[in-house]
Amino acid sequence: MRRATDLVTRLQARQANDKSLGQHFLIEEAHLEAIVGLAGDLEGRNVLEIGPGPGTLTEHLLRSGAIVHAIEIDAVAVEHLRETFAEDIASQALMLHEGDALTTSWPDHIDAVVSNIPYQISSPLIDVLEKHRWRHSAPDVVVLLVQEEFAERLTLATPADRGSLGVCTALGWSSTMDRRVPPGSFRPPPAVMSRVCVLRPIDLPEDVDHRLVRQTVHAAFHHRRRKLRTSLQRPPRRLSRLPGWHATRWKHAMASLAEDAVLDLRPEDLTVEAWRDFCQRLASVEVQNL
């Protein structure tokens, strides 16, 4: 077994950590093993790892029997991985892709995503995950090691954590927080506590277009201190991308719901179910030659 500390030492011998990439490498074997374990039985399954860096998590994924698809943006780390995991690459147990995970095409079929992701790409990565789901299919499970504050917002840990990120994620995923990982478990140590999040896809209700809900939520939280009556006066920026929707229909629907009590609330006052119900009422307003 290739030990995590040795893998990190070998990569750092090639170059110092790139701060612009948010490189904090997990070296605690117990945490690495636990993260992989949260994904369940990975034998023969296609697993996407984003930002493998020195390969500490990659090693544990390979030991689980997974077929690993790893996307790494750092060219030096890619070369290190090619040399260190040459046999795994030759046997196609590891497929290594050099590029930015936010713009590089992911494999069409992914059974799981398991990653220690750079903190600065956490939010945009969730958007990419969502887009991949609608273009292809959702992975059975997503296990991410992220900054604890982000984990709380992602999983809606408390009502105070409600924001567009957590609400939109909850529309299509169940999410939970698992173990905390202290700074000392990384090299170099980050300044904050980290947390493991587990996401699993849930069935979407068919009575409302989830895209309408997402756009409405984003528009409302853009002015989170305003009541919905004010923040939703203007239609969402990308509303016209939704079939049957345009600015005139939006304004007509909002006018028809002028007495709706929800409009006197602020976005953080609404639960996920309340957002769905409100958007269902929006969509059900009769369209008359608009």
Where are the regions a protein language model picked out?
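Catalytic cores of RNA-modifying enzymes
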Residues: M1-A219, D277-F278, A283-L290
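An accessory alpha-helical subdomain
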Residues: V192-R195, L199-P201, E206-A255, E259-A274, ...
